[in-house]
């Protein structure tokens, strides 16, 4: 595993997931530049295990704060000793193959003789598989811990094989669950690097803000003399499917998706809280705000209040500021004025007709019988005025007409007929276009208000409404008993 000559096979598939746990404990000696970097964060030895190197490297990145604040898996080392060591301005802890190569360029295996023999281990192991040599038990054990289709880059040395055989003999009586957990321990160095380095950089930053790092199982300040392998073993035992990720595969496996998802989840949990941009629109208290968005209403349609000079939308009748009624909001009622003008015109026409013709010099002819002519003219004026007054007063009966009837009953009948004629004349004199016709007769206008209680309904003429009252009929609209009928006049 610690062979610096990492030659990739011709088929392109490279993996280290089959390396036993004892290979991870192989002692390595950092080169002077890497050793200087490790000692700057508290390292005191000359030889280290791979896990110790990764731990100190993560401590260095965290101490120098070389990581990106937002994307904490990215490390910037352009102006740092780490950049001189790796020869790159920046890298990501997710680039396992690249980091794996850069680290091992600066490491020297303690036992060079044993590591030099690992270059021919591929052919030797194939011979052992075909010939059935004395190490058949070891091969079977290795076949259980690795995929049959994967190709090896380097094999462990002879001493590591012996240690693996002794470990398998000691653990032969353990349960299958312990054997499965042992296979998790024998995962790739690159996986340990990713978790040791990435979690040192990312997780310990979160430790300063919360105590959520307890669930990760990675110690923040481990005892390097006695507790490195123990803590790393506990961390490997706690992880499950996410440990199956192997960086040496050209094509990512299905397990790698689980690992990447869990890693991204860890990063998201360590970042600051997500901030969402929300736009809040304050609604107005009135309905006039909708006119501003109406494209059919322009500023020319707005009206100006005479009290406070406020510009208001065209539809509301009151000012939005002072609540003053809009000037000329409704047309003036000119019905009365028209009636007065027509009456005055009639009177003038009648007086002009009664006075006769004028001479060109606008003077009347003087006659000897001027008094008699004046009396006759006055009599004519009186008679014509009385006739016009009778027509304007809806043809009221003259007082002299009652003398014609001898009996009192005849007088009552005449008065009843006169009142009916008066009502009919009033109904006929009203303009039909001003009000709707009676619902019952469809001929006369609606001027008979049917009153019941404090309310009334105007839906029939006065004659039809009186007939309903005489026949004790209810109101046709609300079916309430009719109390009275009121004759309604319209201007």
UniProtKB/Swiss-Prot annotation:
Return the EC number. 2.3.2.27
Q: Where is this region: Interaction with MTBP?
A: 170-306
Motif Nucleolar localization signal positions after renumbering to this chain = 466-473
Q: What is known of its domains?
A: Region I is sufficient for binding p53 and inhibiting its G1 arrest and apoptosis functions. It also binds p73 and E2F1. Region II contains most of a central acidic region required for interaction with ribosomal protein L5 and a putative C4-type zinc finger. The RING finger domain which coordinates two molecules of zinc interacts specifically with RNA whether or not zinc is present and mediates the heterooligomerization with MDM4. It is also essential for its ubiquitin ligase E3 activity toward p53 and itself.
Record region (ARF-binding): 210-304
Q: Spell out the residue ranges making up region: Sufficient to promote the mitochondrial pathway of apoptosis.
A: 1-101
Name of encoding gene: MDM2
Task: From the Swiss-Prot or TrEMBL record, give the protein name.
Answer: E3 ubiquitin-protein ligase Mdm2
| Zinc finger residue ranges, RanBP2-type | 299-328
Annotated InterPro entries: Mdm2 (IPR028340), MDM2_mRING-HC-C2H2C4 (IPR044080), p53_neg-reg_MDM_2/4 (IPR016495), SWIB_MDM2_dom_sf (IPR036885), SWIB_MDM2_domain (IPR003121), Znf_RanBP2 (IPR001876), Znf_RanBP2_sf (IPR036443), Znf_RING (IPR001841)
Q: Where is this region: Interaction with PYHIN1 and necessary for interaction with RFFL and RNF34?
A: 150-230
Q: What UniProt keywords are attached to this protein's entry?
A: Apoptosis, Cytoplasm, Host-virus interaction, Metal-binding, Nucleus, Phosphoprotein, Proto-oncogene, Transferase, Ubl conjugation, Ubl conjugation pathway, Zinc, Zinc-finger
Binding positions (Zn(2+)): 305, 308, 319, 322
Q: Which organism is it from?
A: Homo sapiens
Impact upon substituting residue 457 to S: Loss of ubiquitin ligase E3 activity
One cellular-component annotation, GO: protein-containing complex
What is the disease in the record?
Answer: Seems to be amplified in certain tumors (including soft tissue sarcomas, osteosarcomas and gliomas). A higher frequency of splice variants lacking p53 binding domain sequences was found in late-stage and high-grade ovarian and bladder carcinomas. Four of the splice variants show loss of p53 binding.
Q: How is it modified after translation?
A: Phosphorylation on Ser-166 by SGK1 activates ubiquitination of p53/TP53. Phosphorylated at multiple sites near the RING domain by ATM upon DNA damage; this promotes its ubiquitination and degradation, preventing p53/TP53 degradation.
Q: Which residues carry this modification: Phosphothreonine?
A: 419
Report the GO molecular function annotations.
Answer: 5S rRNA binding; disordered domain specific binding; enzyme binding; identical protein binding; ligase activity; NEDD8 ligase activity; p53 binding; peroxisome proliferator activated receptor binding
Tell me the superkingdom of the source. Eukaryota
Give the classification, highest ranks.
Answer: Eukaryota, Metazoa, Chordata, Craniata, Vertebrata
Where is the motif named Nuclear localization signal mapped on this chain?
179-185
What result follows from mutating residue 386 to A?
Answer: In MDM2-6A mutant; abolished phosphorylation by ATM and ubiquitination by the SCF(FBXO31) complex
